[in-house]
């Protein structure tokens, strides 16, 4: 039906007759000549119809936006005065000779020109129209190029694309599972995989030493801008490779991806330990484009007669951190109050501050509501340690260390944007040496997942002191976003059982949930390591989209619904009976009953 894509026509086709198909992006009648902008996935081309061909001209005059048409015509150069440098095809146009309406379009339920006027609900309900927009089409085409490049790289490096099951068993990976009832085994359920983690480890035990898969994963969790109930991972696992070798190989893949598709050389990725990242940036995925850093000042404030400072300063689990903002002394009291409310979102009880109005004037040049509690020596030490200059402001967070890190880390990001301090476009790094466990409500939880290996300890040593053990794990971070995370896996049953015990998973529960894994670990399991990248997030960053919904063909809403298909929906009662499922209606209790 066509000889070329609309967006591919250029000066090399001058004088050629072409056949194009696509949608009418815009139609206008200027002085008895009809101009059509015809659109397909590759872009736009201008088609001109003269009144000399009356029948064809009449059809062209009747066209409206989003009519699906076939055009035949002659490629010619545009007059110099009409060249459009904003269009890929802006140097040429097609003189229309033939025109067939393949399908007319009803009046559109959303705007194609001003998509900002369309609600998110409208865009998802009429996604097939929203995806016709060049911006959306370009993102999906770019996504296809990324997956193609990833496959080429992994294939050429000896990795095998192997599928793993979608109907599987529930495992504790940090989010709720999507459950699928079994008709054959009434009362029992499959779970959709949150990741192929255990199956890819089993593949390593099977001798397939380099595996990959671009795979759908499912998590029933509360959604944010960068989360969806179903998402896509670039899943990788290797045998007989160290964490260093995995990082080198996957960094090579990511650098190649950016160079090939964006012509960006990311350079060598620096390494940073988890502890350093939390200390300097209050985050395990720091945005290194932001030059602001947190500075510990607790040792300077242990003796001050101000409980807000000396309490956390003398608490083993406390922290007092300072954040210097260059030229921040211009902040008004209202702006500082807004920052105080902002850190309150993250659990901080307040925000102390100190303006350096005139460094040369000593204490007279300092403005702060807490200045009366501080000696000149302490103030000078704080200024020296933070590197503050005249015109700067220093903001203080004082609380439990985890609260300070989260609140001041978030404030660091906000201040960096507010003061337009971000430097450079791309700043990648590896974060390494994560804690094995974190304590929540008195119990230990795996920082990554229960199959992550500790670094350099035996099972007995791990159980003797789990709180201070480091995992052999690594995260790839870019501009404050985690692109992917991985680790060396546990490859012997003794260590795996020890980790389960630390996590409070009793032997019977471990056998019921992971008996197949513990059994497999008994039969010559090789050392193995891997990593999984979030494909949707990578595409979002590379295309500059603000949400992963804008780089997925058919995403869900923030309430995990699909306006296009009205999913989820109610099941047929006969199906429920066959599955042995009865839906229990929520009973609303009246006030006072």
Curated annotation (Swiss-Prot):
L-aspartate binds at residues 173, 219, 448, 489. The lineage of its organism: Bacteria, Pseudomonadati, Pseudomonadota, Gammaproteobacteria, Alteromonadales. ATP binds at residues 219-221, 228, 482, 534-537. One of its GO terms (biological process) is aspartyl-tRNA aminoacylation. It comes from Shewanella denitrificans (strain OS217 / ATCC BAA-1090 / DSM 15013). Keywords: Aminoacyl-tRNA synthetase, ATP-binding, Cytoplasm, Ligase, Nucleotide-binding, Protein biosynthesis. SUPFAM superfamilies: Class II aaRS and biotin synthetases, GAD domain-like, Nucleic acid-binding proteins. It comes from the Bacteria. PANTHER family: ASPARTATE--TRNA LIGASE, MITOCHONDRIAL, ASPARTYL/LYSYL-TRNA SYNTHETASE. Homodimer. HAMAP family: Asp_tRNA_synth_type1. Residues 197-200 are annotated as: Aspartate. This is Aspartate--tRNA ligase. Its EC number is 6.1.1.12. Belongs to the class-II aminoacyl-tRNA synthetase family. Type 1 subfamily. One of its GO terms (molecular function) is ATP binding. Catalyzes the attachment of L-aspartate to tRNA(Asp) in a two-step reaction: L-aspartate is first activated by ATP to form Asp-AMP and then transferred to the acceptor end of tRNA(Asp). One of its GO terms (cellular component) is cytoplasm. InterPro entries: Aa-tRNA-synt_II, aa-tRNA-synth_II, aa-tRNA-synth_II/BPL/LPL, Asp-tRNA-ligase_1, Asp-tRNA-ligase_1_N, Asp/Asn-tRNA-synth_IIb, AspRS_core, GAD-like_sf. PROSITE patterns: AA_TRNA_LIGASE_II. It catalyses: tRNA(Asp) + L-aspartate + ATP = L-aspartyl-tRNA(Asp) + AMP + diphosphate.
